[in-house]
Amino acid sequence: MFYTNVETLLNTNCFALLPEAYAPFDPLVDVLPIIPLLFLLLAFVWQAAVKFR
């Protein structure tokens, strides 16, 4: 019973929809989750620049 409720919640896109007032920011919200990955890549580039001291 619990799993069917979770499936229902995940199948609805209520988590992915912004309120209408914030609709212009939708492209920005799509990109925001990538930013932590960029910091991770930056750490590797930085260590490569200092030869992994």
Curated annotation (Swiss-Prot):
InterPro entries: PSII_PsbK (IPR003687), PSII_PsbK_sf (IPR037270)
Subcellular location, record wording: Plastid, Chloroplast thylakoid membrane
Transmembrane feature ranges: 28-48
Membrane topology recorded in Swiss-Prot or TrEMBL: Single-pass membrane protein
Keywords, comma-separated and alphabetical: Chloroplast, Membrane, Photosynthesis, Photosystem II, Plastid, Reaction center, Thylakoid, Transmembrane, Transmembrane helix
Any one annotated GO CC term: chloroplast thylakoid membrane
Domain of life: Eukaryota
Residue ranges listed under propeptide: 1-16
UniProt family annotation: Belongs to the PsbK family.
Function summary: One of the components of the core complex of photosystem II (PSII). PSII is a light-driven water:plastoquinone oxidoreductase that uses light energy to abstract electrons from H(2)O, generating O(2) and a proton gradient subsequently used for ATP formation. It consists of a core antenna complex that captures photons, and an electron transfer chain that converts photonic excitation into a charge separation.
Name of the protein: Photosystem II reaction center protein K
Source organism (scientific name): Euglena anabaena (Euglenaria anabaena)
